[in-house]
Amino acid sequence: GKSRHTKDYIEKRGKIQISNELKDRPEEANNRSRLGDWEGDTVAGATGKACLVTYVDRKSRFLKCMKIAKKKSDLVKEATIQLLKEEPLCTITPDRGKEFTAHPDITEELNQVQFYFPLPRHPWDRGTNENTNGLLREYFPKGKDLTDIPEEYIQEKVDELNKRPRKCLGYKTPYEVYYSETLHLI
């Protein structure tokens, strides 16, 4: 079975340097009043194999996703830069996973975007992303090896999710909300 640690166990694999706490995140990000506040995470496939890097815009629920070969911080960094470099960008709220240790490099690369980290083991602080990852799991069940799944198929499923009406958006799709807003920004 899975090995577990006692409650006194201290993690020895290094600590992630936290740049900002979630409580310091701007109010506009907290109340979803603007585009460009992203929540990030990784969706693991089979253990040690390929995974998905996901970012969800808090206001529109618009999903950006990319497959990477392994859950490594340098690969997550490259995927993040590629996914978000053309998008409106105000804040990023990832989880506290070791895969986000390269966040200072991402900040430098993406116009000084600030990262806001939630408390450890508080996934509900990034509920938008966790919910969307749950929707992604309809297509990519837990433990499924993502290595042989083509990027085109993944993007097809991401597009399906972005074009699915959501009750919280007044039955508009994330795509409609995101692109009607970004067109106003131009």
What is the predicted role of each segment?
Residues 107-110, 114-115, 119-186:
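Charged alpha-helix within mobile-element recombinases
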Residues 45-48, 65-86:
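Active-site beta-loop-alpha junctions of metal-dependent nucleic acid enzymes
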Residues 1-52:
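Mobile-element integrase/transposase regions
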Residues 48-50, 58-63:
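Coil-to-beta-strand transition motifs
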Residues 41, 55, 61, 80, ...:
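Mobile genetic element proteins and their domesticated derivatives, centered on retroelements
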Residues 87-102, 120-121:
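Acidic/histidine-rich, metal-coordinating catalytic segments
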Residues 50, 102-105, 128:
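Short, well-ordered secondary-structure micro-motifs
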Residues 60-64, 84-90, 139-140:
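Short, surface-exposed connector motifs at secondary-structure boundaries
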